[in-house]
């Protein structure tokens, strides 16, 4: 049922790309931020049944995600209709172009695979964590919610550099291309470094948003501090992935993602879990980052 409802929010990705293609990335930031904030607000309400809402447990987290994505999609549709003058949304005279569809999939399939790899990684890691305690799974879920706020501006900048790099690559303007790549890498590293310090300084405050139990607080504090150590490296890697996408070579990012998440991270997490201490499992993220 949750999967069926969530498919209704899928158009948000197409809607956001329409805004990106015309340089209106500020609206993408607004839609994604709004969706993430609503998700975080609705999580405890639906999980624990606050304010008269039904107590849904784990399913509540899924429905909170669906609700946030749906609001983001509707907001993105509004921006396209009211603000995106270059794009007219209409099915009148609509006719598929197989050549265009082929070009889209040549670039899009690696991204599809990378998204799938991420889902497989999360599923596999949850299977490892649940052998310790379900609280560990909850802590991992809390981390993913929190890290979205740190990664969001970097992914937004990544979306912004793609058309700039692609345009200057086509125009053979190497000076501007190199300058864009340099500045993107610097800003990505700086933003993620700030995020690392936040996760190190106030993990208890961040986890408090999830009404964390003492056990979740202990597990989550160590988790946030260890995983955030590689945030600066991730900032650079995300920007590099944007360069590959702009040059039509996103397949390289796909290879890196597969190696990092499936060949390195999951096996490392599995073997580290055999040491009997859940804190060691988070070190797998540090090891895997060297293969990003």
Question: What spans do the regions from the language model cover?
Answer:
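Short alpha-helical transmembrane segments in multi-pass integral membrane proteins
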Residues: 1-9, 55-109, 165-230, 271-292
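Short runs within selected transmembrane alpha-helices of multi-pass transporters and secretion channels
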Residues: 7-20, 28-36, 61-75, 155-158, ...
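Small-residue-rich hydrophobic transmembrane alpha-helices
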Residues: 12-28, 139-197, 201-203, 234-256
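Small-residue-mediated transmembrane helix hinge/kink sites in multi-pass secondary transporters
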Residues: 17, 44, 111, 163, ...
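Transmembrane helical elements of multi-pass membrane transporters/channels
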Residues: 35, 68-72, 76, 80, ...
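Hydrophobic transmembrane alpha-helices of multi-pass small-molecule transporters
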Residues: 39-44, 73-77, 149-152, 196, ...
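Structural signal for membrane-spanning alpha-helices in multi-pass inner-membrane proteins
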Residues: 43, 47, 76-80, 126, ...
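Helix-terminus/linker motif at the lipid-water interface of multi-pass membrane proteins
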Residues: 45-56, 116-143, 149, 167-168, ...
